[in-house]
Amino acid sequence: MTVETDELSSAKRRLIFRDAVTFLGLILVTAVLLAITLFLFRSFTAHRAELAQRWSGRGQNALNQGHPEEAIVALRTALSYAPDENSYELLLAQALGDAGHLDESYNYFLGLWDAEPGNGFINLRLARLAAKKRDTQAAINYYHAAIYGTWEGDGTVRRREVRLELARYLISIGNSSSARSELLIAGGNNPYDVSVELTLADLLQQAGYPKDALNYYRKVLTQEPKNEPALLAAGRMEYEGGNFEEAHRLLEEGVAEMHEGDVPAGINMMLANAAHIVAMAPSEKVSPDERVERILHARSLAKTRFDECNAQVSAANGPTSPLQSIGSRWAAEDASLGRKALLKDHTEEDATVKLIFDTEVQTSQICGAPTGDNALLLLLSKSQTVEP
């Protein structure tokens, strides 16, 4: 009985041992299979990530090289490997817009905007797309959202760049007053930067605000008196505004900063004209004798111009000349006063100057633009640089 019991116990132990070994083997096999599966899965995932990066890189390069259609194909492929990658979605939306698929790009960016309404880049792209779609108000709204949105990197610089872009857009659609407001805000937020100040001045000039533009050019020249672009631009604006003396100074200094062969012909002509106008202008700054000499010279030029123009219109219109009124002024005794008489009566000097300027303006309207010194007198008369 004892022998049988021992054999039964031994058989049970062998059975338990065999089952344990089998179970342990199954566990080991399962562990190995799990490890292999995890390895394959991770390898597959890594491979997909690598492929996604490779295709997105191709898309980025295609965008940089100006091939948006190629970029679209590459980026769609990248998204097939990494469907939730936000950076790839942004690039694809950008590529769609660059390729001219405006509606598709707009809708894509709108979907991204729903997730990140404060993203500066997304709002900027939506602003540009809205502008292309001629949705003016939406474009302006998105530009403002981009300005006040979040940016990676130097947000201050990016916001300023967006505000300048908005100003350019406003100028392009004829909304100059709003453009001026944006530019002045950009200027107020700008720590002194020459390139930015010059850009602001150029844009203000384009917007039709020459005084504001000139203030920025002067601001640059206060810090950098020999800044060539500012000297030339300010000189042109002073010339166009009729301040020929200041124009001559600025243009002369600007030209001095340039190599002789680099000076534009228009600048040289403007400089020469400004010098000539300053030399012939009946300014109060010169001596009384010199002023009267200039008045007499200008009167001779204006009278010759009147006589030529009057003969031309009289031949065409007969006795009813449109210059009849100015002609009666020339026929008056005080229109031929000599040097001594003018020196004794400052009022007559000013009256003669007014006759000269009125003659140049009226003859230009009736007989066309004059040439030579008369053309310079016309510029002088329009600017009213003569001082009381």
Question: Which sequence ranges carry the predicted segments?
Answer:
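TPR alpha-solenoid repeat register
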Residues: 88, 122, 156, 162, ...
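Alpha-helical segment of the N-proximal tetratricopeptide repeat
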Residues: 48-84, 91-98, 165-172
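Conserved structural position within tetratricopeptide repeats
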Residues: 77-80, 110-114, 145-148, 184-188, ...
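Eukaryotic alpha-helical solenoid repeat scaffolds
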Residues: 232, 236-240, 244-388
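Register position in tetratricopeptide repeats
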Residues: 64, 98, 132, 168, ...
